Amino acid sequence: MKKRILYLLTAALMIGACTPIEIREESGPIVPASAFEYTITNDPVNDYILYLDNQTPEVMFSWDYAWGVTRQQKDTVRMLVPGTYTIKITALTAGGIVNDEKTITVTKADPTAFQEPEWEYLSNKAAGKTWIWDDTQPGPWGNGGFKGCNAPCWWVVNMTDLAGRGVGSDEMTFDLNGGRNLTLKSASVPSAGPIKGTFDIDLTVFKEGWDVGTLTTTNTTVINGIYTNNSNAVVENFYILKLDEDELVLSSPEPGVTGDWGTAWFWMFKPKSK
């Protein structure tokens, strides 16, 4: 049985009083993870295909397999690149939520995944790729016109000034080892790192001739990924203006900006090895 709590709130006008009415049923027992009955099996030929099967009576699973989440009790999922993965299980039992996890290894890549070259440009797949400021530019960070400029063109901040802001030596690493991982190695902005999170890219063009898609980050950001004019709010959504083996150029409009030539911020990076 599931606990049910019903509150009936009765308020008298100008008085503000309320009377809670509570109806309870005793909850059932918590099923411990040691009692779970489930299997996670690699396909014997293509081990990037996983078969998930929960056979635990009266327990519902949610499976987080790094590339997505499924609430199907029996499902087939694909692990996109080789690596060691931790499958995280959130189980709803009669007495509450119980967590469990299992580690699996994948040795083959899903041939249908990450076919666009931009994924390799950005992350070098599972091996990872580290980016730093592009110090060959007059100013690799600053602001300019949204959907107009292709680099900082109003306030252009050079490497000396970036060092003065405490972000000149920061680094960020993208990789596809067990997920879409982004690690920011930061001295202080938005906080002292490393700050680990995830990322995704969408290669749908927003404005023809200006961008090539979008980059989204979760629980982390890029180097100096803040809106300086908006209380240093962390930026998690970027337009990709250029992405190849040697350059990554990003832009993000200030909150509320949608029109051409509104204020936007720009970031210009190069691979660390370059």
How does the language model describe each region?
Residues 1-40, 95-104, 108-122, 272-274:
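Bacterial Sec-dependent N-terminal signal peptides
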Residues 46-56:
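A short beta-strand segment in extracellular, disulfide-stabilized domains
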Residues 60-78:
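Surface-exposed, flexible coil segments in extracellular/virion-facing regions
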Residues 72-94:
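Solvent-exposed segments in extracellular or luminal domains encompassing
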Residues 133-178:
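Short, solvent-exposed loop/hinge segments that bridge or flank secondary-structure elements
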Residues 194-202, 227, 245-274:
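Edge beta-strand at a domain terminus
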